[in-house]
Design a protein with these regions (language model features):
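Short, well-ordered beta-strand elements within core beta-sheets of diverse protein domains
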Residues: 48-53, 227, 235-240, 324-326, ...
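Short, structural beta-strand-to-alpha-helix junction motif
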Residues: 54, 79, 111-112, 119-124, ...
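N-terminal flexible segment immediately upstream of the FAD-binding catalytic core
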Residues: 1-63, 79-111, 359-381, 418-429
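FAD-binding subdomain of flavoenzyme oxidoreductases
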Residues: 103-106, 117, 122-259, 263-265
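C-terminal substrate-recognition/cap domain of FAD-linked oxidoreductases
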Residues: 248, 252-442
Length: 442
């Protein structure tokens, strides 16, 4: 680094500290290494990490940084594995968004919530539940730490996705800081007269430009999400299948029927990994929450007892498992949906089993992200594809054939694999292969 460049960098740091405070401009090697890696890999080190407390600080910091030709990169909870916030150039500044974590407004009349991008799904879920409200899609499995802004940037799925789709499908409007530091709003929030962020389709869909972009096109600072009443009743089904073709067919049919808030499945290997990983302490906590989640104290205790009795042994002889969660506003509507699922799945050779897993997952939707390592500390990374239902079985066939051809290579490098399946609204089918392997320190 030349003297002139050093002086310019020192001035940049000084200017950023004036805006953000000394403690919110990080430059130690330890900090830079931590922030310059995601779940999958490390990248070249960022030049700096900055941690704004609010939108105005962020706006000023971005304007200062880009004026000096530095790339600025948003980072949420740091739980992605897609290179989205990893530096690609030497002059990069990572922006930690986690201090922008407030819930700004819960509008029960117009049924939307305004939340800052650094808020976690776990926090949002708990606050809304206390008001008997929920967002339609309500978070990824990593929602204990993953942020709303990260989900909108990555377009994540899981809880609620079977009916309501992905994270981006729930968004009504955004506040965004652009590369020059200017601040814009989208949707009906952008109108100059009595703005209210209740409606996304206000002119051209500028909201969509900033969704599913991994943060590349702007810094989402505030996000407006639809609200629905918290479901009064929930019920569960699980099924065992002998082959992947039947489970894929069943999941697609359930998805097309539009009756499952969540519809997901595991292959034998990934199912086994999940069961190995969970500890007794986690099980006890899960059982307590299963008991609390029943429609009455007695019903909750009965549910917890069934889960305790069947436990993990229910999966001992299950090749492929499919799990369904059904929400509704009455017992009769729930029962109708449950019977529709059975009518779809049983002719596909699905054998009904105790739905312990979906009960536990709904009772504790945001568990610690211990799935980011194998049960013995192995490295972990998933990849995925989303296809229309008409291509789901073919994609699984291609996946199986590919790995069958790579058996020797997988054994040589001690790589094991499995996959998660999930449906997205009526149209999408997700196949997510997951890899486990011993890294260089084993």
């Amino acid at each position: 680094m030349t003297q002139l460049v050093k002086e310019g960098f020192s001035e940049l740091i000084s200017n950023l500290k004036q805006v953000l405070g000394n403690e919110n401009v990080l430059s130690s090697e330890d900090d830079l290494k931590f922030y310059s890696s995601d779940v999958f890999k490390e990248a070249m080190l960022a030049s700096l990490v900055i941690v704004p407390n609010n939108t105005n600080q962020l706006s000023q910091a971005i304007e200062i940084s880009t004026r000096e030709n530095y790339c600025v990169i948003p980072r949420g909870g740091g739980l992605s594995y897609t290179d989205s916030y990893l530096p690609k150039k030497n002059n990069s500044i990572i922006v930690d968004m986690q201090k922008l974590n407030n819930i700004i407004e819960i509008n029960e009349d117009d049924m939307f919530v305004v939340v800052e991008a650094g808020c976690t799904w776990d926090h949002l879920y708990k606050v809304l539940k206390s008001k008997n409200l929920r967002t339609p899609y309500f978070g990824a499995l990593s929602g204990l730490f993953s942020t709303v802004g990260g989900a909108m940037s990555q377009n994540s799925i899981f809880f609620g996705s079977g009916i309501y789709g992905s994270a981006a499908d729930q968004c009504l409007g955004l506040e965004v800081v652009l590369a020059d530091g200017s601040i814009i709003k989208t949707g009906s929030w952008a109108t100059p007269h009595n703005p209210s962020p209740f409606f996304r389709s206000y002119g051209p869909d500028l909201t969509g430009i900033f969704l599913s972009d991994t943060g590349a096109l702007g810094f989402k600072t505030k996000i407006v999400i639809k609200l629905i009443p918290f479901p009064e009743f929930t019920d569960f089904l699980s099924f065992s299948f002998k082959d992947y073709k039947n489970i894929a067919s069943s999941m697609s049919k359930v998805s097309r029927a539009g009756i499952a808030a969540e519809c997901f499945g595991f292959d034998p290997y990934l199912q086994g990994q999940r069961l190995k990983r969970e500890g007794l302490l986690k099980d006890l906590k899960s059982l307590a929450n299963v008991a609390k989640s029943g429609e009455s104290v007695l019903a909750g205790l009965k549910d917890a007892a069934r889960v305790a009795v069947t436990g993990r042994s229910i999966f001992k002889d299950v090749p492929y498992s499919m799990h369904v969660v059904v929400d509704g506003d009455s017992k009769s509507s729930i029962q109708s949906s449950i019977e529709k699922v059975r009518a779809i799945v049983i002719p596909e050779n699905g054998e009904e089993i105790e739905p312990s897993l979906p009960k536990i997952m709904r009772a504790n939707p945001f568990s610690p992200p211990n799935s980011m390592l194998g049960p013995n500390g192995e490295r972990w990374v998933p990849i995925h594809a989303i296809v229309p239902h008409s291509r789901a079985k073919k994609l699984l066939e291609v996946v199986h054939n590919f790995f069958d051809e790579k058996v020797d290579l997988l054994e040589e490098h001690k790589i094991e694999w499995g996959y998660l399946l999930a449906t997205i609204s009526n149209q999408g089918f997700l196949v997510e292969p997951v890899f486990f392997w011993e890294d260089s320190r084993f």
